[in-house]
Regions:
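C-terminal terminal-subdomain/extension
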Residues: 1-30, 96, 100-156
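Polybasic/polar functional segments that serve as interface/processing modules
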Residues: 34-37
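Short, surface-exposed secondary-structure edge patches
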Residues: 40-45
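Loop/turn positions that initiate beta-strands
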Residues: 48-51
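Short, charged beta-turn/beta-strand-edge "cap" motif at the junction between a beta-strand
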Residues: 57-61
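Compact nucleic-acid interaction/catalytic patches
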Residues: 62-104
Length: 156
């Protein structure tokens, strides 16, 4: 294990261009993933429809990245895996059928095309709105469900 560690450090020292910010961010994300494995978020308080801060990490190309709020859509039975729908303020009111505006939060859009499954360890803490844990309204839930059906059945 010690040799593996030394070899990895040596390779990184030679191969990384420390002037390339994207490569530095990626290395930081690798380190952050180690820390995430120690995260023991209390999953008992999490439920579908809640909005939570989720660490999407430093991904490749135009994949979604960084810490951002996301809707907890559904979980595995033991709540160790969650399907999440990230939220964005940049897509609000843009009329794409795979973006669903959330009426219960100011300038928030559910990015259905970036729906993903993650370990509960990526869930940081609840997202608050008006001093309360944010949760989808029944109308927002229904609107997302309709949009998801369109997105996954190619009915636009």
């Amino acid at each position: 294990l010690k040799l593996l560690k030394e070899s990895l450090i040596q390779k990184l020292s030679k191969k990384i261009d420390y002037k390339n910010i994207e490569k530095i961010k990626y290395l930081k994300w690798c380190y952050d993933k180690l820390l995430l494995n120690d995260n023991n978020t209390k999953t008992s308080i999490l439920k579908p429809g809640s909005i939570c801060w989720v660490d999407f990490g430093q991904n490749v190309g135009s994949e979604l990245r960084k810490l951002r709020p996301a809707i907890l859509w559904r979980s595995s039975a033991d709540k160790k895996m969650w399907t999440v729908i990230p939220l964005s303020s940049k897509c609000y009111n843009d009329k794409y059928y795979f973006h669903c505006d959330i009426n219960g939060l100011p300038c928030s859009t559910a990015k259905l095309e970036s729906m993903a499954n993650f370990s509960y360890k990526r869930l940081r803490e609840p997202f608050f709105h008006n001093k309360k844990i944010a949760h989808l309204s029944e109308d927002d839930y229904s609107n997302i469900l309709v949009s998801l059906k369109k997105y996954y059945t190619f009915e636009n």
